């Protein structure tokens, strides 16, 4: 994707709950990911890569600090349910020297565009030169999200993937050619949890998955260990809806179609960012990385 240079630009796209089996280039003929498939043909495709923790916040902390959860101390998702107990502008990784801070010292301009989920989103700009993020980490909907955009606060009605893609392209377009940049584009999709994927898809890929039998998702029963784990969470009273809904998603066809449609939305965003780099003649001098915080419990294991 890029030619060797002293300080290449870096674009790190981080999807949310996107499993390795959720791409055409990994053998899934039901999902629609033409841009990721094209990228894989000229890139290194890691087939044995493992996330440090199958929870959102620990993975994000690890990618920004280079530390394992046992080192940075974040072992589960950071839940806004307890936000009233947080210090003002609390940043869960504030004590560590993070990737964007290291790159800034090397002369990079740095930007977080997308989901933060490492404490109070108000604190995200402290470690990035530019920040456009969501005011909460948990994804309740892909639409009507409250946005933190520098000093501005507003609600954006459209799909969050399109919104953050637009912001990423704006950032690339305004970056100086004299200074390398690090763009951490963190999509809050495909996500895979209710209520965000509950029901049939309504985005522009809805027709593609209409009536799909979703044969790429196993139809086996849920293991006893998973049921026991869910029961423990329910007994602890986490959340309002009960974690037993997680057991329903792998066998709920409308939700699965919705989930795959959100994967296609992410793929579309990847394609648009690649095109923006090519249009600005930056593709050959940009290290382009696509990854996910972790996968999604759809029954493959």
Residue map of PLM features:
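Active-site-proximal cap/lid insertion segments
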Residues: 4-8, 15-31, 136-159, 163, ...
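Short, polar loop motifs at secondary-structure junctions
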Residues: 116-119
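Short, structured coil segments at secondary-structure junctions
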Residues: 126-127
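Active-site segment of extracytoplasmic enzymes that catalyze sulfate/phosphate-ester chemistry
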Residues: 12-13, 19-98, 102-111, 122, ...
């Amino acid at each position: 994707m890029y030619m060797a240079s002293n300080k290449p630009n870096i674009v790190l796209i981080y999807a949310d709950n996107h499993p390795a089996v959720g791409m055409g280039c990994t053998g899934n003929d039901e999902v629609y990911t033409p841009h990721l498939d094209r990228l894989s043909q000229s890139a290194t495709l890691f087939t044995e890569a493992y996330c440090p923790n199958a929870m959102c916040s620990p993975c994000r902390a690890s990618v920004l600090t280079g530390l394992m959860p046992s080192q940075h101390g974040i072992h589960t998702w950071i839940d806004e349910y307890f936000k009233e107990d947080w210090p003002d502008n609390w940043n869960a990784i504030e004590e560590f020297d993070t990737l964007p801070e290291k790159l800034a010292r090397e002369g990079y301009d740095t930007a977080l565009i997308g989901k933060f989920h490492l404490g109070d989103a108000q604190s995200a700009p402290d470690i990035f030169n530019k920040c456009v993020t969501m005011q909460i980490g948990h994804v309740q909907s892909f639409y009507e999200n409250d946005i933190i955009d520098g000093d501005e606060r507003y609600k954006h009605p459209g799909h969050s993937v399109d919104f953050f893609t637009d912001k990423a392209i704006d950032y690339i377009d305004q970056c100086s050619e004299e200074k390398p940049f690090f763009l951490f584009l963190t999509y809050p999709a495909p996500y895979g949890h209710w209520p965000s994927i509950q029901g049939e898809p309504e985005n522009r890929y809805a027709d593609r998955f209409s009536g799909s039998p979703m044969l790429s998702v196993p139809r086996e029963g849920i293991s006893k260990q998973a049921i026991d784990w869910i029961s423990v969470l329910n007994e602890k009273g986490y959340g309002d809806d009960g974690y037993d809904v997680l057991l329903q998603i792998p066998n709920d066809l409308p939700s699965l179609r919705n989930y795959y449609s959100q994967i296609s939305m992410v793929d579309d965003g990847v394609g648009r960012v690649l095109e923006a780099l090519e249009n600005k003649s930056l593709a050959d001098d940009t290290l382009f990385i696509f990854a996910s915080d972790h996968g999604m419990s759809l029954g493959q294991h």
